Amino acid sequence: MKKIVKVILKLLIIIALIIGGIFAYKKYMEYLEEERIKNAIIKIDFITPLEIEYNKEIKLSDLIISINGELIDDFKIDTSIVGEKEINFKYINEENIKVPYKFKLNIVDKTQPILWLSDVYSVNVGTTKKLEELIMCGDDYDDNPTCIVTGEYDLSKIGSYNLTMEAIDFSGNKTTKDFLLKVVKPKSSSSSSTISFSYLYNQYKSDNTLIGIDVSKWQGDIDFEKIKEAGVEFVFIKLGGQNGIDGDYYIDPKFERNIEGFKSVNIPVGLYFYSYANSVSKAKEDALWVVDQIKGYEIDLPIAFDWENWSKFNSFHISFNNLTKAAGEFINTLKSNGYDGMLYSSKNYLEKIWLKNNYSTWLAHYTSNTDYEGTFKCWQRTSSAKIPGITVNTVDFDICYK
């Protein structure tokens, strides 16, 4: 028995020595590697100044003029937050040493705020809101740019006033605009001319297009059979929206009738939701509400994020970047629940407000031939179409591309 114990002890000692030796060898090799790295030749020339515009798409290699080796990973750099950012990377130098390196990158916002203001701005006499509330003033990064109107004016009296408006963002970028304020009598609304659906259909129907309409309560009780006979190939139906910022959700009074009616005549259905989201989290809430309302319905086409509160934009306290992210959150939340989403907006806002994105787009541009240069899936051509089956008001005419 004693002999067995001695043998076991010897084996344990041998094992301990082997493990200790391996550990010591590993530490020694780590030391050698640290020394190699410490003494490695590093030759890297960066762009000067090491400064990049906010939200610009760049890779690590875009910042390097020359390097004595090859990058292990030429990764994309996140430039979504203004300020100083530490960048860490590794590369194999000319001695075949894997060298870690870090540097500071300054991310800056040099884009001026936007004042949605022409040379002449008209308001109705008796308007109680301040001009700073009425005139759209926004920024790509700053949720709350400073917006000031200078000069004397009186909204309770008809007249003309020479004024200046200034917008300053978080980074000190400034936009200044001189304009003529006209305080005028309210004008009576005049009816606009209409265009027959059949004329538009013949003009825009091709092998590459589908012709449709979008509807809400404003189209009243629709005769779906007549709509089908007129040649409508798809429809976007208003599901509902929200009663202002943080207001209650509502379902369009004609939604149920419309979706069941269009389904009964086999017209493919998409939806749109009128959003008042003032944050990414609110847009997600919007999307989840939408998903909850449409359970049990088969939705054939995308569900559009319809955000067009431009006349009240200043009260939302949201940057163009965060607004664009909000649209993305709405679309991505729909996608995670099995639905396609898209962004609805007009040409001017798509070009000047919404930041670069890869969202499927429903373009609103009321013209015979759009010159919008971005990509779009559908085009809302006019809001003045007349079609058999809708006797209350006109209807929006849409073209979708196959």
Question: Can you describe what each PLM-predicted range is?
Answer:
Residues 29-68, 111-142, 189-191:
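Solvent-exposed, low-complexity, repeat-rich "mucin-like" stalks and linkers
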Residues 105-109, 181-185:
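Interdomain boundary/hinge segments at the C-termini of tandem beta-sandwich modules
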Residues 205-230, 236-327, 335-337:
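Substrate-binding cleft of extracellular glycoside hydrolase catalytic domains
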Residues 334-351:
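Aromatic-lined carbohydrate-recognition surfaces of secreted/lumenal glycan-active proteins
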